[in-house]
């Protein structure tokens, strides 16, 4: 039995259990011979970000990361707690899920401060050290475009593991310099000393072309793997700064047949995952 957390309208989180076999999708027609799409490769790559995390709060931002977190929970990371973000009424009624408990919304911040969370955020800009911008494009005093705002990015990046999902890998996103830093990268965390660097961990960056990380001596962004059908040259051309590129770059692992069955037959029957990469 796997557990997920569902946000309620009155700022509570109710815990729901997902029952059933983790290995087979319900009503799936997927066979071992079905080739995975690029979106499905990305779902699995996002799922891998939470491997080994144990009982932490998984907070995916975006459809593909959400599918990845749910896939991880159904397979190799059953201890994950998921914030589904569904608005459901507190009044009695049939919801189709089993409420096993609840957690006050205020306790989410306790979990954040304790490092019991791993968020996968988006990014309008990311530089080579992982400094992230989701606030504005251009000079902050007179920006060309106003975006989400800083939001919880600073607290996320100094308190618990953070990964990023970028559905369209381009030099505009992977920029030489972030116009405004919201989530701090490795260079800024180091400059802050112990308060900034103690719990700072940027796990992976998953894009429509590749998986990247910061496993270098100076924590500069590194190409970890390229997705099937993509080339190293494609990733380099789509990045606005020099990447650390190993001599041998592996191919991102494709979904196993059981994972494809879950994605197609249980988690995303409408096939919305492909639209996020379009």
Q: Which residue stretches match the model-derived regions?
A:
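Cationic, low-complexity basic patches in intrinsically disordered or flexible, solvent-exposed regions
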Residues: 10-11
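N-terminal leader/transition segments
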Residues: 23-30, 273-278
